[in-house]
A protein has these predicted regions:
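Primarily recognizes the serine-hydrolase "nucleophile elbow" in alpha/beta-hydrolase
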Residues: 102-168
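Hydrophobic/aromatic beta-strand patches that form the interior of the parallel beta-sheet core
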Residues: 9, 52, 82, 160-162
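Active-site loop/turn elements of alpha/beta-hydrolase fold enzymes
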Residues: 56, 79, 86-88, 164
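Catalytic nucleophile-loop/oxyanion-hole region of alpha/beta-hydrolase
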Residues: 62-64, 69-70, 84-118
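N-terminal cap/lid segment of alpha/beta-hydrolase-fold proteins
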Residues: 1-45, 49, 93
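Short beta-strand element of the alpha/beta-hydrolase
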Residues: 47-57
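A fold-wide structural signal in alpha/beta-hydrolase
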Residues: 50, 75-85
Length: 168
């Protein structure tokens, strides 16, 4: 049962809130497009839980060893996974939180196509990603104004916080 990496999905239609076109960016990372990279188990059987993975990196980058390898490990446990490439420096709060909440909503919006259970969406994060995962769990909502994805809940059904930054 080998997992497949589905096409990377932009979190936002067009540019993320508050971003500018690459030619107007004052920092290379300012023009980066936040994405969700799904790691899906083969179709068949009942819908499975899905875990959104938030790599750490001090909000200045994203640690590669806390991204794709973790998603593949989750696949080995029988879970779908999706790695969220959220905005980091020069972006500050609330940009990473907006991206992580959007990733949860987007996973819910694609649940049928991904054979995922929209009622069993979890989030896992390391270090700064753990802080972000805790924030998503704490500030989850039932949907906000906006497009069809925005109107879906950002509440998670499970939280896994791996050495989260919870005190400064």
């Amino acid at each position: 049962m080998a997992p497949t990496t589905d096409a990377v999905v932009n979190l936002w239609p067009g540019r993320a809130p508050g971003t500018v076109a690459a030619e107007h960016a004052s920092h290379a990372m300012a023009a980066e497009i936040p994405v969700l990279k799904p790691f899906l188990l083969p179709a068949g059987g009942p819908p499975r839980p899905l875990v959104v993975v938030l790599p750490g990196g001090g909000y200045s980058g994203r640690a590669a060893h806390e991204a794709d390898p973790v998603a593949l490990w989750l696949n080995g446990l029988g879970l779908h996974a999706a790695v969220c490439h959220y905005r980091v420096f020069p972006w500050r709060h609330p940009a990473p939180l907006e991206d992580a909440q959007r990733a949860v909503r987007l996973a819910r919006s694609r649940a049928a196509a991904w054979n995922a259970d929209p009622g069993r969406i979890g989030i896992l994060g390391f270090s700064a990603g753990g802080h972000l995962a805790c924030s998503v769990a704490n500030f989850g909502d039932d949907g906000i104004d906006g497009d069809d994805v925005a109107r879906l809940p950002s509440r998670v059904n499970a939280l896994i916080a791996c050495y989260p930054v919870v005190s400064f």
